[in-house]
Swiss-Prot record:
Function per UniProt: Required for insertion of 4Fe-4S clusters for at least IspG.
NCBIfam families in the record: iron-sulfur cluster assembly accessory protein, PRK13623.1
Binding note for cofactor: Binds 1 iron-sulfur cluster per subunit.
Gene name in the database record: erpA
Official protein name in the record: Iron-sulfur cluster insertion protein ErpA
Assembly with partners or alone: Homodimer.
Matching InterPro entries: FeS_biogenesis, FeS_cluster_insertion, FeS_cluster_insertion_CS, FeS_cluster_insertion_RrpA, HesB-like_dom_sf
Keywords: Iron, Iron-sulfur, Metal-binding
Intrachain disulfide bonds: none
This protein's GO CC annotations: cytosol
Amino acid sequence: MSTLVSLPTVAPAPDYQSIDRPLNFSVAAAAKVRELIQEEGNADLALRVYIQGGGCSGFQYGFEFDENRAEDDLAVATDGVTLLVDPLSLQYLMGAEVDYTESLTGAQFVIRNPNAKTTCGCGSSFSV
């Protein structure tokens, strides 16, 4: 005899196109990206931020320059510099801020992510 089992429903992916600013790209981060793009000598570059499995907390952030924008990428422009995020990564980054900080301990890009339940000590991986 077979039994029907109902599966839990999955919430639909957020419609980032209807949100005014689903991700914040700070002026400080944009300025640093502009500087790095100028060093590369390719004005067509944008900074891509993505999430991948790994790190001590389960997920980790990745950054890379990209000339190609996919049709479904979110593009956030700050001071003429573009940040790209793919839809899968955006689910984990909704409401986050991409910033750049300089301190006595060094300079780095920082993601302040309200969706991260825990982060590792170095700040490069998180869990949800």
